[in-house]
C-alpha cells in the first residue's frame, strides 16, 4: 500500500499512527492535501480487504479520522489509476459482488430496498432538507441562493422541460414527499398521479397535499411502477426525478418499456433526472460493490448516460426519442455540501435523542455494516470476509463503538455513515466522476415542443 501511495501524482496524503507520521505525494502542488489519523490497527485490515469500502467502514467505526472527507474523496479519484493497483482480494471482491445480488430490484425486493433508505424516519430527512422536502439535486443561481429557492428552480426546470399544461395528466414517477407533484399543480393546474414505495413518504405527501388544498388534483399511490396498468392509465407527461437509480441495470429496458406504454403515443414527453456514472468506469462499476449500494441505497445502481439511452431505445422499440440532455454535477456538489452542513448542525439537537420510527431498519443496517458480511449460498453463512481473505478473526462490528443504541436514538455510527455519504458524493460530483443528468424523451411526431418554454 505504501509503495502504491508513493506513486500518487496529484495532491498529498499524510498518515499518522501512534505518533509516527509519513507523507506521500507532493504537499506543494495544487491538489487536495489529506491528513489521516489511524486510531485502530483494524483500519489496515479493512483497507486491504475491501479498499475504498473498507475505508468507509473504518470511518464509520471510528478507526480513522480525516481532516477533510471531501478532499480525501478528491485525492482518491485523482489518483485512482495508481491506488487501484493495491486492489482488494479478488476472492473477497467476487464474493462481495455475489452477495450484493441479493438486493436485486425484482418486484419482490424493490419495496424492501426503498424502505431501507426512505423509511428511516421523516424527522431525519426534515433535518437536512428544505421546507419543500425535495431530496434531489438543486439548481443554484449565485452564491447567496437559498436551498429552498434552488430546489424550486429545479422543479420549475423539469416542469418546463416537460411542457406541462393545465389539461395534462402527469405521472410523478418516484414522488418522494410530493414536492414536484405540488409544484406542478401550483404552476399549471394539471392532474398528477404520484407513486412511491415508501410508506413514510406517502403519509407525509398526502398530509402536505391536503394542507395545500390539492387533494382533488393529486393522488399518491403506494405501488411499484411495473404494476401500473397501461390499459387504465395514459399520461401526457412523465417526470422521473432521481428514481431510476433504484431500478437496476438489468431492469432499465423494463423501466423504459413501462414508461413507453404509459405515455401518450403522440404528444407524450418524459423528463428524467438521474445521477450518472462516468462512461469510462461504468463496466467496472456494474460488477462491483461500493459504499453507496451497500450502506445507503441497497439495490441502487448509478447508470451511465449511454445505458439510459440504450435502455430507452430497447424498451420502447425506438419510440422514445431523445430530445435533449444536460449535466449539472457542480450543482449537486453544492447541494450535498449544504445537506451535510445541515445534517451535522442538527444531529445532536434533533436526532441523538429521537427514537427512530422504524428502529428495525437501523438494526438491519448494523448487520450490513458489521464485520460479519452476509455471503451467498456458495459460502458459509458464518464466514466473514476477513476469514475468507486471510484466515484471521472476523472484523469487529463497526457499531461496537456507538454510544447509543438504535432503540434509544440515531447513534454516532449512523451519523458518521451519513456524513461520509454526503462527502463521498460531493467529492464525486465536484470532480465530475459522477454526473447529474437531465434527459428529455418524446415522440417522433410531437409538435407540442414548439412551446417557447421548452426552447430555452
Task: Please state what every model-predicted region is.
Residues 1-151, 157:
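Feature captures hydrophobic
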Residues 205-206:
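Conserved SAM-binding loop
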Residues 226-238:
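A short acidic, Gly/Pro-enriched loop at the edge of an enzyme's catalytic core
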Residues 253-267:
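A short glycine-rich, Lys/Arg-flanked "PGG" loop and its adjoining helix->strand segment in the class I
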Amino acid at each position: 500500500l505504501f509503495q502504491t501511495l508513493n506513486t500518487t501524482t496529484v495532491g498529498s496524503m499524510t498518515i499518522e499512527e501512534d505518533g509516527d507520521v509519513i507523507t506521500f505525494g507532493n504537499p506543494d502542488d495544487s491538489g487536495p492535501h489529506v491528513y489521516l489519523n489511524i486510531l485502530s490497527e483494524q483500519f489496515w485490515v479493512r483497507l486491504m480487504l475491501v479498499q475504498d469500502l473498507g475505508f468507509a467502514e473504518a470511518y464509520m467505526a471510528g478507526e480513522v479520522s480525516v481532516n477533510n472527507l471531501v478532499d480525501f474523496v478528491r485525492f482518491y479519484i485523482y489518483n485512482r489509476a495508481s491506488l487501484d493497483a493495491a486492489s482488494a482480494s479478488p476472492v473477497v471482491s467476487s464474493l462481495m459482488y455475489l452477495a450484493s445480488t441479493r438486493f436485486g430490484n425484482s418486484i419482490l425486493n424493490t419495496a424492501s430496498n426503498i424502505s431501507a433508505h426512505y423509511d428511516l424516519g421523516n424527522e431525519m430527512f426534515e433535518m437536512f432538507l428544505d421546507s419543500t422536502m425535495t431530496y434531489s439535486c438543486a439548481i443554484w443561481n449565485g452564491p447567496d441562493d437559498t436551498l429552498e429557492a434552488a430546489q424550486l428552480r429545479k422543479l420549475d426546470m423539469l416542469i418546463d422541460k416537460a411542457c406541462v399544461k393545465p389539461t395534462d395528466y402527469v405521472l410523478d414517477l418516484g414522488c418522494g414527499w410530493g414536492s414536484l407533484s405540488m409544484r406542478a399543480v401550483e404552476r399549471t393546474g394539471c392532474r398528477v398521479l404520484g407513486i412511491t414505495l415508501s410508506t413514510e413518504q406517502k403519509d407525509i405527501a398526502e398530509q402536505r397535499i391536503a394542507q395545500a388544498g390539492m387533494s382533488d388534483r393529486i393522488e399518491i399511490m403506494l405501488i411499484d411502477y411495473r404494476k401500473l396498468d397501461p390499459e387504465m392509465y395514459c399520461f401526457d407527461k412523465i417526470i422521473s426525478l432521481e428514481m431510476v437509480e433504484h431500478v437496476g441495470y438489468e431492469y432499465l429496458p423494463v423501466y423504459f418499456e413501462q414508461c413507453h406504454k404509459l405515455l401518450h403515443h403522440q404528444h407524450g414527453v418524459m423528463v428524467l433526472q438521474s445521477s450518472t456514472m462516468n462512461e469510462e468506469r461504468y463496466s467496472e462499476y456494474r460488477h462491483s460493490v461500493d459504499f453507496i449500494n451497500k450502506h445507503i441505497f441497497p439495490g441502487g445502481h448509478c447508470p451511465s448516460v449511454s445505458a439510459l439511452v440504450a435502455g430507452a431505445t430497447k424498451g420502447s422499440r425506438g419510440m422514445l426519442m431523445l430530445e435533449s440532455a444536460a449535466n449539472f454535477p457542480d450543482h449537486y456538489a453544492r447541494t450535498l455540501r449544504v445537506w451535510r452542513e445541515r445534517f451535522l448542525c442538527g444531529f445532536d439537537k434533533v436526532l441523538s435523542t429521537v427514537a427512530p420510527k422504524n428502529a428495525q431498519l437501523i438494526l438491519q443496517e448494523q448487520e450490513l455494516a458489521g464485520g460479519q458480511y452476509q455471503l451467498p449460498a456458495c459460502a458459509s453463512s458464518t464466514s466473514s470476509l476477513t476469514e475468507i481473505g486471510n484466515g484471521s478473526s472476523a472484523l469487529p462490528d463497526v457499531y461496537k463503538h456507538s454510544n447509543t443504541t438504535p432503540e434509544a436514538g440515531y447513534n454516532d455510527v449512523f451519523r458518521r455513515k451519513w456524513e461520509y455519504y454526503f462527502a463521498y458524493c460531493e467529492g464525486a460530483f465536484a470532480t465530475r466522476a459522477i454526473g447529474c443528468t437531465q434527459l428529455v424523451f418524446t415522440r417522433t411526431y410531437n409538435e407540442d415542443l414548439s412551446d417557447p418554454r421548452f426552447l430555452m
